[in-house]
């Protein structure tokens, strides 16, 4: 008996040109893959970080060098960074040198010692010779009588550092944010730039944004005391970092909340608190501290400042997911204390900012957030903390902020910052 045929099945025969085409395509794909692999292993640039130590015999160590943002520290750091910039920008590594940064000053019996972090980007194929080449360049230049820097022979010259630790150090300087000026308004619903305000954080309860805060140290925030009127237990709070609330850069739990001893919920004075995080954050281009001004810092009326936050875009309006910013002006306390403005309610611990014409202002949900000003070196300082006001953007009712300089010593007493 014959076996019945299987319906629809027949033998396929590949034509020679089909086999050739398939083989060629496979070989081409393999060649591309090998090419990419070779490029990655040989030509792709890799970042390298080296720590170097130098001796400066011409300068005597002073306690001012350990004081953050002191004039002596700022000037010496800039002088050293400029010297390293010139050395490498005029060398065979000029296309691979990225930047340098002074990490620390140390006392020496005969001068000052400085620890410096140097960043390079170089193809992988040349990575093996980078350290020796950089070492040779530095040695040659520093032996010159024109250089005020000398090699610190007590330590290995160039010590490689891992990327995470190095980036943390490179971004540890305060106040590095938006390049001023830039125009955007909370009232228009325009979001802030991606790395504009890297100290801004969100204080949340059960994942809901309630207040803003500013990062002033790897484990410390400063914010408004009234943010904790209803929720005083630190365990209820979490902190979110990053430009968007829905996709945070990182989060932390809260270890403790320190509210100013004289704060009372029924008044606006002493509206300041500091928050200690459960663990330190790792600094990056998107996560940095804002600078704190000294208690003697003065700001003039009409000075341009920025306030940022995730507050309502207008009175009783929607809340954004992306961080918003608005540029406003400092208004003197005398003007804000006029009868038709706030009628004497503004104390020396407060600062007034906005416009008497209204429109541009902080709003509900911005409480605790930063009011910042830029200096001539493009460093941003925390002038105020969003505290209170009447409505949002109302005529003759500008925003009122806690004056940070007034509480500078209090902040230092609680955080050692």
Swiss-Prot record:
One of its GO terms (biological process) is proteolysis. The keyword Transmembrane helix applies. Keywords: Disulfide bond, Hydrolase, Membrane, Protease, Serine protease, Signal-anchor, Transmembrane, Transmembrane helix, Zymogen. GO terms for molecular function: serine-type endopeptidase activity. It is an enzyme of class 3 (hydrolase). The active site is at residues 226, 271, 367. Highest expression in lung and tongue. Also expressed in brain, colon, heart and liver. Isoform 1 is the predominant form in tongue whereas both isoforms are expressed in similar amounts in lung. At the cellular level, expression is confined to epithelial cells within the cleft of the circumvallate papillae extending into the ducts of the minor salivary glands, the respiratory epithelium of the nasal cavity and tear gland ducts. Residues 1-22 are cytoplasmic. Its EC number is 3.4.21.-. GO terms for cellular component: extracellular region; plasma membrane. InterPro entries: Pept_S1A_HAT/DESC1 (IPR017329), Peptidase_S1_PA (IPR009003), Peptidase_S1_PA_chymotrypsin (IPR043504), Peptidase_S1A (IPR001314), SEA_dom (IPR000082), SEA_dom_sf (IPR036364), Trypsin_dom (IPR001254), TRYPSIN_SER (IPR033116). Residues 44-417 are extracellular. The chain crosses the membrane at residues 23-43. Belongs to the peptidase S1 family. This is Transmembrane protease serine 11G.
């Amino acid at each position: 008996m014959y076996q019945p045929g299987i319906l629809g099945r027949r033998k396929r025969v590949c034509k020679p040109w089909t086999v050739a085409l398939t083989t060629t395509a496979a070989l081409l794909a393999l060649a591309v893959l090998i090419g990419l692999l070779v490029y990655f292993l040989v030509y792709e640039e890799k970042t390298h970080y080296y720590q170097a130590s130098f001796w400066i015999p011409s300068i005597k160590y002073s306690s001012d060098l350990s004081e953050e943002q002191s004039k002596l520290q700022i000037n010496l750091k800039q002088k050293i960074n400029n010297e390293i910039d010139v050395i490498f920008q005029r060398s065979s590594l000029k296309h691979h040198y990225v930047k340098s940064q002074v990490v620390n000053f140390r006392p020496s019996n005969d001068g000052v010692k400085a620890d410096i972090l140097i960043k390079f980007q170089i193809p992988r194929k040349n990575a093996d010779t980078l350290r020796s080449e950089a070492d040779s360049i530095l040695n040659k230049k520093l032996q010159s009588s024109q250089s005020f820097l000398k090699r610190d022979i007590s330590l290995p010259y160039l010590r490689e550092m891992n990327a995470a630790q190095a980036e943390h150090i490179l971004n540890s300087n305060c106040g590095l944010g938006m390049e001023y000026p830039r125009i955007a308004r909370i009232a228009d619903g325009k979001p802030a730039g991606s790395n504009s305000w890297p100290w801004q954080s969100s204080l949340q309860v059960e994942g809901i944004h309630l207040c803003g805060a500013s990062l002033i140290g790897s484990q410390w925030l400063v914010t408004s005391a009234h943010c904790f009127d209803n929720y005083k237990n630190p365990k209820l709070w979490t902190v979110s970092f990053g430009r968007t609330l829905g996709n945070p850069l990182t989060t932390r739990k809260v270890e403790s909340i320190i509210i100013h001893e004289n704060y009372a919920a029924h008044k606006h004075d002493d509206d300041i608190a500091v928050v200690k995080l459960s663990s330190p954050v790792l600094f990056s281009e998107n996560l940095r501290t804002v600078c704190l001004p000294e208690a003697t810092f003065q700001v003039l009326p009409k000075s341009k400042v920025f306030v940022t936050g995730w507050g309502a875009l207008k009175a009783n309006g929607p809340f954004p997911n992306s961080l918003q910013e608005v540029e406003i002006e400092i208004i003197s306390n005398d003007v804000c204390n006029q009868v038709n403005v706030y009628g004497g309610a503004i104390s020396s611990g407060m600062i007034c900012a906005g416009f008497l014409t209204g429109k541009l202002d902080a709003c509900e949900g911005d409480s605790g957030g930063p009011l910042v000003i830029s200096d001539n070196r493009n460093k941003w300082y925390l002038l105020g903390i969003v505290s209170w006001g009447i409505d949002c953007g109302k005529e003759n009712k500008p925003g009122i902020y806690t004056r940070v300089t007034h509480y500078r010593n209090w902040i230092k007493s609680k955080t050692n910052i």
